[in-house]
């Protein structure tokens, strides 16, 4: 039997009190008490229960972290067993086998068969920082390319890669020098006005031409160490590039000895129906940055990288808590669960996408529906003809959905992402889509 969402009052009295204290004592700048006043008390599977007894479907997965579901019994058991043994003994100076076991599993799952190593961290931002250091240290090249609308983190160095929203940069200039941004091949809306769904090769070629004709005018190719990219842009709007784009980019980069640094922090660990999102595109990246879902809710991240560009001398890189033994134990179990779930993710992902495509045909304000697996999104516009962005309506839809028990998150300027835990069933998707359509209608009034 499907347990449906049940919301009596949002926010309820207990939630209101917690939210008031939250803003008094915590320096938070990303929470949205107007549209998402949800104060979690516990989670189970795809459901979240708040402090006032309201029940929600979590189609945000804790911002892409809870891929195997809230409090998955196997993950909880792995955490308990490890916590009873020891909770910390830093990899900076000491050794424990589970850190090696997880690294072996991740390397085995990486595309291709080149020799690789893993360096651990705690967050996606840390993983991207480590990747930048690996590229600089391993190649001697000090400059990077990244994409407009990309998100790679908010710490000072990786903020130079991030180009998602100007508010993320406001007050922090100068960021690290040596990063040049290029257009991402967004099939729906791009600099050149190309319909990338109808002309994917043309869109791909325009991006490569931009690098060669404009970037290389002022950045020497031999000084560029890597191109940082997301196989599907996350915070930029869940944008899926043309199928052949990354193969073309890899061929182009190889001509100049430039590495590809694949940020899988949000799209990896089974989210798209493949363990790594880049597998959909048939490319073997030189570095794979991972995070979010790998720890099953605990802080864990890292970089899988070519062994020939690794840190090979003492003291070049370390982090006290990177590869924490409790998080590693959770990660080992997460990998096994996700491997079992991959066929299911492809099936229910297609099922969810069909709903979104139907909504696109039915409603003038849904300009695009896109995604792979359970990384899906719709883009909200004022009209299909003009494609004018409609962020105000997007926010109202998110608010109305939450009031009815469906937790959604925006992405990009005007899109909504649908990223439930990978264990979601078709019946639960039916309920969620019923709620979403009700919320959409209410927001349009």
From Swiss-Prot:
The modification N6-(pyridoxal phosphate)lysine is found at residue 292. It comes from the Archaea. Gene3D superfamilies: Aspartate Aminotransferase, domain 1, Type I PLP-dependent aspartate aminotransferase-like (Major domain). SUPFAM superfamilies: PLP-dependent transferases. Optimum temperature is 85 degrees Celsius. Homotetramer. Disruption phenotype: Disruption mutant cannot grow at all in the absence of L-proline. Belongs to the class-III pyridoxal-phosphate-dependent aminotransferase family. Optimum pH is 6.5. GO terms for molecular function: identical protein binding; L-lysine 6-transaminase activity; ornithine aminotransferase activity; pyridoxal phosphate binding. Pyridoxal 5'-phosphate binds at residues 124-125, 266, 320. L-ornithine aminotransferase involved in L-proline biosynthesis. Also shows high activity toward L-lysine. 2-oxoglutarate is the best amino acceptor, but 2-oxoadipate also leads to moderate activity. PROSITE patterns: AA_TRANSFER_CLASS_3 (PS00600). Its cofactor is pyridoxal 5'-phosphate. Pathway: Amino-acid biosynthesis; L-proline biosynthesis; L-glutamate 5-semialdehyde from L-ornithine: step 1/1. It is an enzyme of class 2 (transferase). This is Ornithine aminotransferase. The keyword Transferase applies. One of its GO terms (biological process) is L-proline biosynthetic process. It catalyses: L-ornithine + 2-oxoglutarate = L-glutamate 5-semialdehyde + L-glutamate; L-lysine + 2-oxoglutarate = (S)-2-amino-6-oxohexanoate + L-glutamate. Signal peptide: none annotated. Keywords: Amino-acid biosynthesis, Aminotransferase, Proline biosynthesis, Pyridoxal phosphate, Transferase. Its EC number is 2.6.1.13, 2.6.1.36.
